[in-house]
Amino acid sequence: MAENVLSAQKRTEQGKGPARRLRQQGLIPAVVYGGKREPTHVALDPATLLKAIETPHKFNTLLELQVDGASKHVLFKDYTVDPVTRKLLHADFLEVSMDQPVKVNVPVVTVGRAAGVAEGGILSVATHAIVVEALPNKIPVRIEVDVTELKIGRSLHVSELKAPEGCKFKFQTDYVVVFVAVPEKEEVAAPVAAAVPGAAPAEGAAPAAGAAAPAGGAAPAAGAAPAKGGEAKGGDKAKK
């Protein structure tokens, strides 16, 4: 990994006021963490920083930071931008030693076309970055995962991947990295038969809500009691 040189100056004032004045001068505040010392607060040119991190590594870019004549190796770790202007407002660096391994997140990139995709499956990436331990100048740009032989319904775990030369995976080995999912089938609702106007309900079925009651002249069922207040015709015959 090639190193880019970045110049900065140490700052003694912290807070919103001093940071605002720095930005008015065309500089931004930054902090260097790590090592056995307290964090170092510096000021630097944002345009120079953006140019220095125009590398495939991005957040793991190794830089030589020169602060008031003293040099230290750092990794670019984080930044803050203005939500409206998108201008760089702040940056964070991690100080490293060139002979001591560090742990960093390295992005996962799939290579090839999965066999399961040709069968109608859907390739999904479950783990987008893997923690890798390596010397600062051996940090890989990406972890390439060959998915060519991956069939539908199958997956690849961290334990099945080969770490780049000079690196160790510091990640749970049983984690799924990529898989080919079985496509979901759309369920088609069964058609509902439309009711025929005037059709009698099935035997034992209750009439639909709002349906008319039986006609007044309809005979009651065998053995049924007469309606309340109605006359029993059989009783009239008995009186005669």
Curated annotation (Swiss-Prot):
A family per Pfam: Ribosomal_L25p
Region (Disordered): 1-21, 204-240
Gene Ontology MF, one: 5S rRNA binding
Superkingdom of origin organism: Bacteria
Biological-process GO terms, alphabetical: translation
Keywords assigned by UniProt, alphabetized: Ribonucleoprotein, Ribosomal protein, RNA-binding, rRNA-binding
CDD domains referenced in this protein's UniProt entry, alphabetically: Ribosomal_L25_TL5_CTC
InterPro entries (UniProt xref): Rbsml_bL25/Gln-tRNA_synth_N (IPR020056), Ribosomal_bL25/Gln-tRNA_synth (IPR011035), Ribosomal_bL25_b-dom (IPR020057), Ribosomal_bL25_C (IPR037121), Ribosomal_bL25_long (IPR001021), Ribosomal_L25_dom (IPR029751), Ribosomal_uL5_bac-type (IPR020930)
GO-annotated cellular components: cytosolic large ribosomal subunit
Keyword rRNA-binding: yes
Annotated Low complexity bias: 204-229
Ranges of biased composition (kind: Basic and acidic residues): 230-240
Self-association state and partner proteins as the record states: Part of the 50S ribosomal subunit; part of the 5S rRNA/L5/L18/L25 subcomplex. Contacts the 5S rRNA. Binds to the 5S rRNA independently of L5 and L18.
Family, similarity comment: Belongs to the bacterial ribosomal protein bL25 family. CTC subfamily.
Function: This is one of the proteins that binds to the 5S RNA in the ribosome where it forms part of the central protuberance.
PANTHER family reported for this sequence: RIBOSOMAL PROTEIN L25/GLN-TRNA SYNTHETASE, ANTI-CODON-BINDING DOMAIN-CONTAINING PROTEIN, RIBOSOMAL PROTEIN L25_GLN-TRNA SYNTHETASE, ANTI-CODON-BINDING DOMAIN-CONTAINING PROTEIN
The name this protein goes by in its record: Large ribosomal subunit protein bL25
Source species of the chain: Anaeromyxobacter dehalogenans (strain 2CP-1 / ATCC BAA-258)
Designated gene of the protein: rplY
